[in-house]
Amino acid sequence: MTSKNILNKNNCYDAILVGAGIMSGTLALLITEILPTIKILIIEKLNKPGSESTGAFNNAGTGHAANCELNYTPVDENGDLQIDKALFINRSFENSMSLWASLYSKGKIDIKKFLKFIPHISFVTGTENISFLKKRFKAMSKYPEFADMEFSSSFNQIKSWAPLITTCRDPLDKVAATRIKRGTDINFQALTREYLTYISKNKNVEIFYNTELIDLKKTDKKQWKLKVRSLGKIVSLNTSYVFLGAGGKTINFLQKSKIPEAKIYGGFPVSGKWLICEEKSLTEKHNAKVYGKADIGSPPMSVPHLDTRWIEGKKFLLYGPFAGFTTKFLKKGSYLDLFSSIKKSNLFSMLDVGIKNNELINYLFSQSFKSHNSRVENLRNMMPSAEPSNWYLENAGQRVQIIKKTKDGGSLQFGTEIVNSGDGSLSALLGASPGASTAVSIMIEVLKKSCLFNADKFELEKKLSNLLYESEIKNESDNNFLEIIKKRNNSILGFHP
């Protein structure tokens, strides 16, 4: 990774992106591809890219496509299964696949560095959960996004799909699973490196590490003035556009911007931990990502899953995440992060959320103090043969869920949200899941609402479409469009059904 060593005072840029994770990396790549003359600066507090929320051990990183995540298909109060979110996430992830295919076909990134195909499985036990999974399968498999989904309640069939979840399990247990072979494991940290390595070849792109945003404010000239600390020196920078993609810390920076749109937001930090296994005799037996159902009362990000992961060329098994609570907004943040985010404008909504979600807070604290054996016992619900000696505990990344002011007080939201200034000169990304997997769709939306997109919008839209789908695919409204895209992506990325 290359970047200049000296950040000069009063440098002017067309766009400054705060944070060198997957979001900023994706946005910077989109800008350089369709607006190559735009002068971009990316600043990162740490000494390398993708080290916080994007880090391989810090995020779910499963290549979310809503294939197996049961929390994306909730049952409403009338007992009806809601699949709209799953369809949206799947289509968004296909956009990510399309971009990677386009870039790879042109030799701009190397998919072998970050992408592997691996089946995605949903696994449940008990009559009620099996009924839910069968209902989910029937509803989803009608759509082309999930037409390849398989369902089985056969113990032996499930054993052939994922032997570790059946070893030491009673063959008479009531079990069921769905499988989609076209799942992925994505190392978003490695992908971010690929993006930044490629765009750094553009003379209009600068990337600075060990550079921290201190403050930002709007000037009389309709520009943003940023104060940053770079290698121990305080430097002022000017730009027409700012993107805040600093993970959990984004809420603090958004508040410093003082845009009116920021006043309704607060943050609720949630930490996480993984059980990790490197034992080759186990990692070689599990080639799938298996998602279960969350415990009643647990937050959506705590849906248990047993994942095959490839990180820096090595195969791991990860189980979790186990939730926890800390006042930090970043893994390498400050314990004062939460307190510094409390303002007059969000105090009432944050207190209201705290009162309404007392059970959740108690759950997070109880999870924080679980013993190793207790966590392994939890793992045994999915992998009955698990032994404590084969697993060790590691901290996962930090998440800051959105607290949003409402007419009734405050609402705690699990998801992502884009905040834009009225004039399009500043954008910020708040929240967490599904996050990285839908980065391409999210950043396209950010770009379209930014002041950078004020030129010939028709021409820019055309460039974006060509970037994702190649010029030979003309009609996005065609009924066979998704089928055409998936076939093209499979061919380029190397998935063979």
UniProtKB/Swiss-Prot annotation:
Question: What lineage is on file?
Answer: Bacteria, Bacillati, Cyanobacteriota, Cyanophyceae, Synechococcales
Q: Which residues form a coiled coil?
A: none
Q: Which family does it belong to?
A: Belongs to the MQO family.
Q: What class of enzyme is it?
A: oxidoreductase
User: What superkingdom does the record give?
Assistant: Bacteria
Quote the EC number: 1.1.5.4
- Any one Gene Ontology BP term: tricarboxylic acid cycle
Its pathway, per UniProt, is: Carbohydrate metabolism; tricarboxylic acid cycle; oxaloacetate from (S)-malate (quinone route): step 1/1
Q: Name one Pfam family in it.
A: Mqo
What this protein catalyses is: (S)-malate + a quinone = a quinol + oxaloacetate
What this protein is called in its record is Probable malate:quinone oxidoreductase
The coenzyme or cofactor needed here is:
FAD
Keywords for the protein's UniProt record, in alphabetical order = FAD, Flavoprotein, Oxidoreductase, Tricarboxylic acid cycle
**A Gene Ontology molecular function term of the record:** 2-hydroxyglutarate dehydrogenase activity
